[in-house]
From Swiss-Prot:
Disulfide bonds, paired cysteine numbers: none
Protein name (database record): Anhydro-N-acetylmuramic acid kinase
Physiological role: Catalyzes the specific phosphorylation of 1,6-anhydro-N-acetylmuramic acid (anhMurNAc) with the simultaneous cleavage of the 1,6-anhydro ring, generating MurNAc-6-P. Is required for the utilization of anhMurNAc either imported from the medium or derived from its own cell wall murein, and thus plays a role in cell wall recycling.
GO biological process: 1,6-anhydro-N-acetyl-beta-muramic acid catabolic process; amino sugar metabolic process; peptidoglycan turnover
Protein keywords: ATP-binding, Carbohydrate metabolism, Kinase, Nucleotide-binding, Transferase
CDD domains the record matches: ASKHA_NBD_ANMK
NCBIfam families, sorted: PRK09585.2-6
Amino acid sequence: MRVIGLMSGTSYDAVEAAAADLELEGEALVMRPLGHLSAPYPDGLRDLIADSLPPAAATVRTVARLDTGIGQAFADVAVRAVRELCGGAAGLVVSHGQTLYHWVEDGAVRGTLQLGQPAWIAEATGLPVVSDLRGRDVAAGGQGAPLVAMTDVLAMAALPGVPAALNLGGIANVTVVAPGAEPLAFDTGPANALMDAAVRHFTGGAAAFDEDGRRAGAGRVDPGLLRVLLDDPYYGRPAPKSTGKEQFHLPYLLAALAAAPVAEPDDVLATLARLTAVTVADACRAHGVTRLVVSGGGARNPVLMGMIAEELPGVDLGSSDALGLPSDAKEALAFALLGFLTVNGLPGAIPSGTGARRASLLGSITPGREPLRLPEPAGEPPRVLRVVGGP
């Protein structure tokens, strides 16, 4: 089946699309990536998203505008993906949507909201769409995150030692696959979220992120600010756990700076990069990780990657590209995989990773132009991901 995955992460800067041919062969799920593309959100829509994220408040009218605008932006990218990546023919679109709110109380997730009306995608492409992938896991008592864990576990199944997959988006999440143990997956804390917020704040919105980590590389880590940031109780909570920009946002950073003032913006950025490195490393050390497979936007930040390497001496650090999963496309491919599992009657969440009571079939299906025809339910779930070929 030819599947398109659509994703926009907590950095909410663009819609990412990746396409792949997916097939079940015995214990293997065989993936042949077909390519990926990215399109920035229209400026007005991106600004509306930014203005609506916590701790800001949004009206129901704004939520409706966002649901339509994000759905239309995803639909535009899906049409391009069908044409440019799939030669005009695909069988399924899987849309993560845009997370606007992840509702956590006392460590338990009560709800999660991803916007981007899938009907726009189905109407534009004529294809069935799997969407709203997180809600079912939350209803089963899980965190609804990190859902990339299924792809991580399958991709690392044959690796020796104790491999872990690290995704550095707005939030950092890690999946640990230790021999003889259930897989573990959780959010370690902020990755780009606080750094991006700091850059926008210090530049008055002229820049959205620290390109190549240049400003962090020019700064010095401030021990006082780092101590204040590391005092957050989130880091001491046991996994499974998840977080988001509901917690790690600009007012959070400004409160930390009020407690531990830092004069130079570059020093703030260096400290935030070190915060990510320390919290990632603490999580990896706690589980004896020997190899770290990195993906996401933060993987392109050499200063951040260097700090993680400094914090984890002796750990083999590399890109998910080595496993056949391009770092920039991995999340979109992961959601393509989850939607493929759904239409084949297979669960997409890992209870030991999300904390759910059971492994659930994920998502809701919006039919395309033709009557909905699903494959016969598969028997056993795959145990390994085999990536072949490529674009």
